[in-house]
Amino acid sequence: MNYLCLVVTLVAVAGAISGEKFSDDNTGYQSTPSLRIRTTPGRRRQTPRTIGPPYTRRTLRTTTDYSTTVENGNLTTPAANSTEKGNGLYGLRRQTPRTIGPPYTRRTLRTTTGYWTTVEKGNGTTPAANSTEKGNRPYGRRRQTPRTIGPPYTRRTTTDYWAAVEKGYLTTPAANSTEKESRPNATQRREISWTFGPLYTWRTTKGYGTTLETTNATSTS
């Protein structure tokens, strides 16, 4: 009798152990037919896997924080090897840089470290694929890829959307002008000046309220 009881017990234990160890239902449980172990609410590890058709592929990634959510729409593909290691606010996530759209409206989904960095969808407002916001900037501040647009005498380049784009003659910000830090007002900025042609001097300003003044032969602050 004791032998029979031992056999029955071993069979039951083997059946429980042979069950599926990890569930794919995003409940936070590791489940077997006879055992359910509750992990910390919201914190779970996922097996990275790529799903969906070619143009909407997305990857479920390994998460270490519940604030890393999986984007389910087009062109919002978290990287398979991307993990959020800090205790971030809900919605903070990292994206895989991808360039999309026709030649004149190309834009790039960039690596984001905060949810305030949104993707510009218009002409000439292309975030750089390697551009990351490293400081604590107010909502909406971001860096753009410099692009020169317009006919020859009205060419202009955008570097940040809060720096207004001048639309007149000879008011062209330089393509190498970037905002590198948050400056409190328009008086604290660095200027790069150079002369172009016999009559006109162009300059580049960095900082809040960057305005470009253009006069014959001279350009003043």
From Swiss-Prot:
Residues spanning the signal sequence: 1-19
Tissue localization of expression: Salivary glands.
UniProt KW Secreted keyword: yes
Disulfide bonds: none
Compositional bias ranges of the Polar residues kind: 25-34, 70-85, 123-133
Top-level taxon of origin: Eukaryota
Effect ascribed to mutating residue 66 to G: High decrease in antioxidant cability
Residue ranges, annotated region (Disordered): 21-155
GO CC, alphabetical: extracellular region
Name the UniProt record assigns to this protein: Immunoregulatory peptides
